[in-house]
């Protein structure tokens, strides 16, 4: 049996000029996040093979200063998984902060490895030289898709195993969990509308999209599904 071992990478990149509708100019910094899951692989038959955790990492790459020669700014040893991406990474519009959710961990019991839900959200200071981890928050179980509003003041995280959405306040480099919205069903991703007044959450198992109302920092779910 042959195993295909390779780093599973997921991407998230946000360009400040892209968020404002402008075209980036040469030499302007643009950041790309690459999350590498180093613990999951497959056999040729498609069976999942799990390795011990502890080798995952997140890379911060500058793709704007010299587009022909992207530069790895820093590699941070942070747990993450291919099961949650590609939506479990986000960068604020001003490129000063990044959020990375870790959906699943690998545990070993009686010689058998299996995946279990995690609840960690990593906060990365992109303005630091080099960028660094500044906080780790506990959100819901199996945090998956997440998004940040255009103002960079509020973030939402869909928690698959908790049937909930976490609401996070962003103030400078400080990120705070301020509320948890019960969704009644498993949600895999959540995203703000462009005006920031609503958000849409995907209820993947039941093929539904839930609508959330956003008023300032208050996020509510009035049982409206599409």
Where are the regions that the model predicts?
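Predominantly soluble domains enriched in secretory-pathway, periplasmic, or organellar proteins
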Residues: 19-226
């Amino acid at each position: 049996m042959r195993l295909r071992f390779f780093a599973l990478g997921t991407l998230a990149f946000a360009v400040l000029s892209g968020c404002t509708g402008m075209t980036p100019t040469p030499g302007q910094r643009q950041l790309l996040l690459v999350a590498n899951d180093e613990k999951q692989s497959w056999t040729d038959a498609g069976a999942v093979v799990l390795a011990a955790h502890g080798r995952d990492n997140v890379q911060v790459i500058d793709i704007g200063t010299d587009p022909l020669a992207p530069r790895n700014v820093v590699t941070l040893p942070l747990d993450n998984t291919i099961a949650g991406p590609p939506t479990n990474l986000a960068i604020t519009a001003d490129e000063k902060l990044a959020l990375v959710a870790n959906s699943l961990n690998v545990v070993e019991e009686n010689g058998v490895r299996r995946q279990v839900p995690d609840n960690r959200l990593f906060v990365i200071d992109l303005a630091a030289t080099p960028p660094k981890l500044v906080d780790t928050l506990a959100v819901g179980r199996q945090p998956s898709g997440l998004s940040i509003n255009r103002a960079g003041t509020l973030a939402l995280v869909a928690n698959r195993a908790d049937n909930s959405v976490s609401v996070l306040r962003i103030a400078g480099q400080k990120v705070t969990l301020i509320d948890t919205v019960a969704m009644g069903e498993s949600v895999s991703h959540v995203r703000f509308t462009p005006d920031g007044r609503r958000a849409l959450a995907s209820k993947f198992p039941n093929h539904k999209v839930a609508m959330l109302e956003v008023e300032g920092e208050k996020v509510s779910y009035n049982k409206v599904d599409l």
